Amino acid sequence: MSNYYSSNPKLYVGIDCIIFGFNEGELNLLLLKRNFEPAMGEWSLMGGFVQEDESVDDAAKRVLNELTGLEDVYMEQVQAFGAIDRDPGERVVSIVYYALININEYDKESVQQHNAFWVNINELPALIFDHPQMVEKARKLMQQKASTEPIGFNLLPKLFTLSQLQSLYEAIYGESIDKRNFRKRIAEMDYIEKTDKIDKTGSKRGAASVSYTHLTLPT
């Protein structure tokens, strides 16, 4: 048995995290400037390698925590990327995850130390290697999941208006949503509660805030 393992090549198992945030009606990605070769100084997703004493899920949580300082964040595995020449440094198979976070709740000092920045998803710079394909796959998976489960609420603060909620889903799908139909669908949801608080950031009159009664967190 030992000869079987030793006679086969070893390779690296990497983790790449696609971190989504929502700000001022736009979907954003947290990207960083790579500080090592190959591709030093170019735009990249946050990543790392799976260690011998951790599962791929635990590795993804660690990578996310190292950048944002956050725990108990919604994360989902997207797929593996394993093209032979995908990383010019070494033979690396990368397991991709996406995470949904409140853009106002993360360790800003840690993000600055990693030279990371929030970038509008519609204005992304050129990304290294196969990272553009990773982002595309992750966004499609998020769109599919958001159509059947309330995962989008993980991108919002605890209190929000229905207009903000509609703006979020328009950003997720990249298209306008009919207000009347959207409000009708929201009214049928039993996990949204109206509060007595008024949000006046959009107008002098203000709009009633609502809250989401439970978040979809990772299992």
Regions found by a protein language model. Give the residues of each.
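Short, cationic-aromatic polyanion-contact patches
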Residues: 204-212
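NUDIX/MutT-family hydrolases
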Residues: 98, 107-142, 146, 155-163, ...
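Conserved small/polar residues in nucleotide/adenosyl-binding loops
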Residues: 213-219
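Short, Lys/Arg-rich nucleic-acid/phosphate-binding segment
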Residues: 197-204
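Conserved Nudix-box catalytic region and its N-terminal flanking loop in Nudix hydrolases
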Residues: 26-70, 82, 147-167
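Short helix-coil junctions and helix-kink-helix linkers
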Residues: 168-175
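N-terminal strand-loop-strand
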Residues: 2-43
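Active-site segment of metal-dependent pyrophosphate-handling enzymes
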Residues: 11-13, 58-61, 65-105, 123, ...
